[in-house]
Amino acid sequence: MNITIITVGKIKEKYLRDAIEEYSKRLGRYCKLDIVELVDEKTPDNASEKEEEVIKEKEGQGILNKIKDNMFVIAMDLGGKQLTSEEFAGYIDNLGVTGNPNIAFIIGGSLGISKSVLARANYKLCFSKMTFPHQLFRVMLLEQIYRGFRIIKGEPYHK
């Protein structure tokens, strides 16, 4: 299985980069992982709603340019479906079984994901109704993907 994480923004904090590196290494046993980092657009202080929408669409165009035609796209979105870890593992497993071995997870920037990217998404997933920094969320997503593969394989880790 090929997993691509397309994300807006760079990771500045060493402890987050270390965690990403650790989970990326662990995932190497289960899938080919590719993390694509896109430049986040600067949002001016007191930006209007229209200015924010323009920024989201610009970031969205960068995301769309990285999505390949054969990718099953899962957008991480507050309006998406919430799953348990077991349901998430089952969903990923089912994608592989049904001929979707190329999965792209999309993490938007601080303003979220553009309408054009949400329209391209095959599935919208929400981890929580809470808001998380997108840098931290990348670690959370990698951990859940790793947990999912451990569940699929029946290996100890998940409790």
UniProtKB/Swiss-Prot annotation:
Keywords: Cytoplasm, Methyltransferase, rRNA processing, S-adenosyl-L-methionine, Transferase
Keyword Lyase: no
InterPro entries the UniProt entry points to: Alpha/beta_knot_MTases, RlmH-like, tRNA_m1G_MTases_N
A single MF term (Gene Ontology): rRNA (pseudouridine-N3-)-methyltransferase activity
Superkingdom per UniProt: Bacteria
Family statement drawn from the similarity comment of this UniProt entry: Belongs to the RNA methyltransferase RlmH family.
Assembly and binders: Homodimer.
Protein name listed in UniProt: Ribosomal RNA large subunit methyltransferase H
Organism expressing this protein natively: Clostridium beijerinckii (strain ATCC 51743 / NCIMB 8052)
Lineage: Bacteria, Bacillati, Bacillota, Clostridia, Eubacteriales
